[in-house]
From Swiss-Prot:
Protein name per its UniProtKB record: Photosystem I reaction center subunit IX
GO cellular component assignments: chloroplast thylakoid membrane; photosystem I
Organism lineage: Eukaryota, Viridiplantae, Chlorophyta, core chlorophytes, Chlorophyceae
Subcellular location: Plastid, Chloroplast thylakoid membrane
PANTHER family recorded: PHOTOSYSTEM I REACTION CENTER SUBUNIT IX, PTHR36082
Organism: Oedogonium cardiacum (Filamentous green alga)
Presence of keyword Plastid: yes
Keyword set, alphabetical order: Chloroplast, Membrane, Photosynthesis, Photosystem I, Plastid, Thylakoid, Transmembrane, Transmembrane helix
GO biological process: photosynthesis
SUPFAM superfamilies registered for this protein in UniProt: Subunit IX of photosystem I reaction centre, PsaJ
Superkingdom: Eukaryota
Parts of the chain that traverse the membrane: 7-27
Amino acid sequence: MKDFTTYLSTAPVVAFAWITITAGLLIEINRFFPDPLVFSF
């Protein structure tokens, strides 16, 4: 188990998880607010 946690903390795995979370967040924001350029405050 120690080797597995060491693998999960390596830079490519952490970068992949970070990019995946960021992409998912952007996709969901764009799903609920499709075009923020048309918001008139």
